[in-house]
């Protein structure tokens, strides 16, 4: 099946009602059907391919890509696909400063690791019931917000975003730090300042699944390429 047909099947072409449109998306809109903007997939296909290739190259070069999608219908997909390809993710809430104040965030990640170790090695058993419950609640709270980035080990090289409106703070932080931004941009969104714009439906579960599966597949392929290059380098060194 061609990429265009896959996109049509996933409903990528369905935008928002005309009343909610952002005029800056005009060049990516094909027309209107029953008051809803239809996205021009002839524009989306090459832009999406460019974005997927960029993500693959970033990972092949040893980079990290952070998947971001905190809206309800994106949460499970973001988490599942990020875990499938071994990339960091944020699927519940974007903490202000998650990138721009990463040093502080890293301290919270360390705290989470310490508490998890205490829970595993039996240290919790020597605490009072109240202290134990407080620590368990802290673990749950930190895990929900930071669980997806606790293995990130530093700032990412790029972020992949579902819904540029909802994740505008994440995008602003990435832009400040010169981190490349790949984003699905619906007809009600502002494409300005996004490095890799993907005009498309950012609400339908089927569309979100389509995007994230393609990105995760690209990461997995790139990881295989990266490992092959490493193995070849090792062979050369040994020789």
UniProtKB/Swiss-Prot annotation:
Key words of the record: Ribonucleoprotein, Ribosomal protein
Superkingdom classification of source: Bacteria
GO cellular component: cytosolic small ribosomal subunit
One biological process term in Gene Ontology: translation
GO molecular function, one term: structural constituent of ribosome
Sequence similarity: Belongs to the universal ribosomal protein uS2 family.
Name by which UniProt lists this protein: Small ribosomal subunit protein uS2
Source lineage: Bacteria, Pseudomonadati, Pseudomonadota, Gammaproteobacteria, Thiotrichales
């Amino acid at each position: 099946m061609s990429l265009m047909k896959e996109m049509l099947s996933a409903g990528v072409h369905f935008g928002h009602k005309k009343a909610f449109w952002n005029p800056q998306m005009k060049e990516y809109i094909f027309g209107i059907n029953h008051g809803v903007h239809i996205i021009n997939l002839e524009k989306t296909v090459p832009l999406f391919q460019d974005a997927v290739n960029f993500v693959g190259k970033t990972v092949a070069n040893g980079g990290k890509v952070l998947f971001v999608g905190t809206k309800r219908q994106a949460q499970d997909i973001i988490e599942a696909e990020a875990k499938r390809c071994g990339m960091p993710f944020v699927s519940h809430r974007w903490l202000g400063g998650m990138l721009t104040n990463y040093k502080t965030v890293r301290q919270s990640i360390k705290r989470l690791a310490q508490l998890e170790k205490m829970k595993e090695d039996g240290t919790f058993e020597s605490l009072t019931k109240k202290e134990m419950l407080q620590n368990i609640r802290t673990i749950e709270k930190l895990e929900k917000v930071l669980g997806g980035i606790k293995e990130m080990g530093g700032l990412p090289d790029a972020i992949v975003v579902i819904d540029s409106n909802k994740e505008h703070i994440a995008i602003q932080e990435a832009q400040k730090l010169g981190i490349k931004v790949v984003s699905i941009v619906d007809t009600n969104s502002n494409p300005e300042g996004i490095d890799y714009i993907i005009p498309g439906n950012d609400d339908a579960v089927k569309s979100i699944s389509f995007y994230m599966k393609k990105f995760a597949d690209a990461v997995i392929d790139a990881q295989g390429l990266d490992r092959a290059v490493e193995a070849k380098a090792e062979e050369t060194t040994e020789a």
